[in-house]
Amino acid sequence: MKIILTAVNAKYIHSNLAVYTLQASAEKAGVFPEIREFTINQSKDSMLRSLFLAHADVVCVSCYIWNISIVEDLITEYHKISPKTKIWLGGPEVSYHAEEMLEQYPFLAGIMKGEGEVTFREIAVYYQNQENGMEGKTLEEIHGITYRDADGAVKSNPWRPVMDRSEVDFPYANLKKFENRIIYYESSRGCPFSCSYCLSSIDKRLRFRNLDLVKKELAFFLEQKVPQVKFVDRTFNCKKDHAMAIWKFIAEHDNGVTNFHFEIAADLITEEELELLNTLRPGLVQLEIGVQSTNPQTIEAIHRKMDFGKVTEIVNRIAKGRNIHQHLDLIAGLPYEDYASFRRSFADVYALRPQQLQLGFLKVLRGSFMYEHTKEYDCHYQEREPYEVLYTKWLPYDDVLKLKDVEEMVEVYYNSGQFVHTLPMIERLYENPFDFFQELGDFYRAKGYSEAAHNRIQRYEILLEFLRDEKQQDEAFFRQMMVLDLYARENMKTRPHFAKDPSEWKNESRNFYQKEAETRTLLPSYAAYDWKQLQRMTHLEVFDYDVLGSGEKARRVILFDYQKRDPLTGNAEMIDCSSGFYA
């Protein structure tokens, strides 16, 4: 009996926690399924080839919002070339309309609904027993499935009771297959909140994995020095003792390499947790915080509990530690959130200066409260995944398109981290930073820039063009701010054409490095190098403005040390060497 678990991931670096967990569960019962992982960017032909040549008796496919269309196409064609293979689907994208799926695809054997660890194991054993002529549970006795019986009739069994999370088998015994990929880990399941747009709100039965077991498994990741472990817990810190124990453990066993990502509710963070977080190695932890909106009416309508004042306090206090990457989320298209309201929400969250500001758009998921109340909100969304909002009674499609442009500009100019010093100077021109991103998005559209790909330097050039033509700003000043940002990121091999001619300070630069090679006062970590090597390994730039301060007219000499970098931005350490440079 050959059973294959199939996943179609969004990117190669992603791994599918579900199929590996199901595999581990089945192996405990003496069934050894294989795994085939693909990505949404692979050709259908290559996926079909891989599955066909496996000659499977049973194929089970994991279905999510990002892959369901591909999966539907794949199984339709696969059934044609392997008609005897039993095809099962599972996952959140099929659990809530299983009967409809079986009617739509008459070749499907069944759908696994809800938690699949035990369900899949019982299905795998069922088919193995069939092959070996052994007795055991029939499909009629397996909870958590909708299936087709021997006569072709669609039958639905009761949903399976949720299981103890400590009984879930660890799927990462062999880490070789996960090299250069993100490890996903689950220490709890369920969510204490009832956000109307989220499927996690359906399962309010919070269950936690035994902490001793969690520590043992995290120790394994740390020993293996995996690059990143991403916790998929919906609200990691909803139980303080659980969160504190894990954070303390990874702090005490930090290997200097592994990074841990957590999704948290910032307003639940306590003083004790804050104190611990502020002691962590820079880069050890990333925090993702879903704000979604700061409109009180919207927050109430989506059944979300959030004290934005507390969120602001916590995010700011974490930011002061300069050791934790913070990723904040907003969602456009929620009830009572019109364009003006979203503009205010954006300004509120942008003011917190997270390392990443994610602008998402409401996705209307089957099974969610929002799905059941679309008529009430006059909410119209795409018929196919990702089921993204098109318009609501508060947000017309014209405004959705504008917000799409803002999203793109934020991604390019803020989240890229390539304009860290330039953006604050531009923001001085605006009452609300949202307006800058909107105007820049309009400029991209008007010039046709949105239709083409642009390299890094071109992004700077377009921004300069915008500031000159649309804002009538001092181009010389912003050129120098952008030169600062460019060299902060890397020691440029090709000098940007809009930078000043460095021959203006050639002699002073040589004198500076010769003196530094003698004194080692500013670059002590370069003790093994002579002055010419220092000059190549670092960068010295003369500015006509106070680029690290007020932006006022003032000569500043900045030394970029690429051996020392900011743990959050990745930018080189910048040293003001103005004093005595021209002496």
Question: Model-predicted segments: where are they?
Answer:
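Residue-level recognition of beta-strand->loop/alpha-helix junctions
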Residues: 7-9, 36-39, 62, 330, ...
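Radical SAM [4Fe-4S] cluster-binding motif and immediate context
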Residues: 166-320
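A structural motif corresponding to the C-terminal lobe/cap of the Radical SAM core domain
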Residues: 240, 252-255, 261-268, 272-438
